[in-house]
């Protein structure tokens, strides 16, 4: 059975059995809950950090996928750059408003594999998370 634990640094959704591991950097509560619920349904373990320091700390869990909200208030581009200094192999998917083309270019330059408009990210969230199970 699934459980969700909350504290001031991370939200962790877990489910018994074999799981993919996902780490996310986002401070938007709506997206945190959507991510946790979708992950729970798919049997994917998700750890969500609300700041760059907690995000980098969660990387010790060896995630298969990293998700970044480029509109997070905690310098997400810097967090991606820092991540890429040590982890070049992990897939990084970021999302933002479709009009933020300059921010999208910065994210790609920082090391994002994919940068999606928020609407596309939401629409394809189940498929994005399912890829972490492979």
Whereabouts are the PLM-identified features?
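Conserved phosphotransfer microenvironments
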Residues: 68-83
């Amino acid at each position: 059975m699934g459980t969700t634990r909350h504290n001031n640094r991370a939200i962790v959704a877990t489910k018994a059995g074999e799981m993919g591991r996902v780490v996310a950097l986002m401070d938007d509560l709506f997206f945190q809950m959507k991510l946790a619920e979708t992950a729970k349904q798919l049997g994917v373990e998700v750890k969500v950090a609300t700041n760059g320091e907690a995000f980098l700390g969660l990387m010790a869990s060896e995630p298969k996928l990293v998700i970044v909200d480029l509109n997070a208030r905690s310098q997400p581009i810097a967090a991606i750059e820092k991540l890429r200094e040590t982890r070049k192999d992990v897939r990084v998917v970021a999302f933002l408003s479709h009009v933020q083309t300059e921010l999208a270019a910065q994210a790609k330059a920082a090391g994002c594999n994919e940068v999606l408009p928020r609407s596309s990210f939401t629409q394809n969230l189940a498929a994005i998370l399912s890829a972490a199970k492979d």
